[in-house]
Amino acid sequence: MDIKIDISISGDKFTVTTRRENEERKKYLPLQKEKTTDVIKPDYLEYDDLLDRDEMFTILEEYFMYRGLLGLRIKYGRLFNEIKKFDNDAEEQFGTIEELKQKLRLNSEEGADNFIDYIKVQKQDIVKLTVYDCISMIGLCACVVDVWRNEKLFSRWKYCLRAIKLFINDHMLDKIKSILQNRLVYVEMS
């Protein structure tokens, strides 16, 4: 079976003609005027840099997802390595994760709701939110995600995104992004 295809373009239309065994069919289709672009979302797991176009919330979403599902036993780049350092800030501000695990009963059915309520109380107790508070909160969320992963509560990492939205506004996310960019440049230069 032979099939012949001819395509001709005229103005804003193109014609597709197919011939198969003495049968001819023509189709007239309008040209698509709008260009479509596929948006490719970067995978931040092995990222070593942080660009101005990168969205901090998207980066945190991936960070919590990877940490909640796979942990830190996988290879990750300098960006995630810098975010991992926020864990230390969290322990300084909120205490050890073991204490919080017991106090909030993180492994229980209500553990996720208890955590969100705790975040709301923390936000209310702060008179003026600082970047340090926000960095500590990111570290706390990451530590909580580790607790849930170890208990095989894999889908709970999404509660940390909710906590971040409750606690950190876009302005503070931009400040955190600048701090991370500076740290990454400093690490690269040393």
From Swiss-Prot:
Among the Pfam families in the record, one is Poxv_Bcl-2-like
What InterPro entries is this protein classified in?
Answer: Poxvirus_Bcl-2-like, Poxvirus_sf
- Give GO MF terms, alphabetically: protein sequestering activity
Q: Decide whether keyword Cell division is in the record.
A: no
Q: Name one GO biological process term.
A: symbiont-mediated suppression of host TRAF-mediated signal transduction
Which controlled-vocabulary keywords does the entry list?
Host-virus interaction, Inhibition of host innate immune response by virus, Inhibition of host NF-kappa-B by virus, Inhibition of host RLR pathway by virus, Inhibition of host TRAFs by virus, Viral immunoevasion
Carries keyword Transmembrane? no
Q: Which GO terms describe its cellular component?
A: host cell cytoplasm
> What is the stated purpose of this protein?
Bcl-2-like protein which targets host toll-like receptor signaling complexes to suppress innate immune response. Interacts with host TRAF6 to activate p38 and subsequently induce the expression of several cytokines such as IL-10. Also associates with host IRAK2 to inhibit NF-kappa-B signaling.
Q: Give the record's subunit note.
A: Interacts with host TRAF6 and IRAK2.
The name on file for this protein is Protein A52
Which organism is this entry from?
A: Vaccinia virus (strain Western Reserve)
Lineage at the top is:
Viruses, Varidnaviria, Bamfordvirae, Nucleocytoviricota, Pokkesviricetes
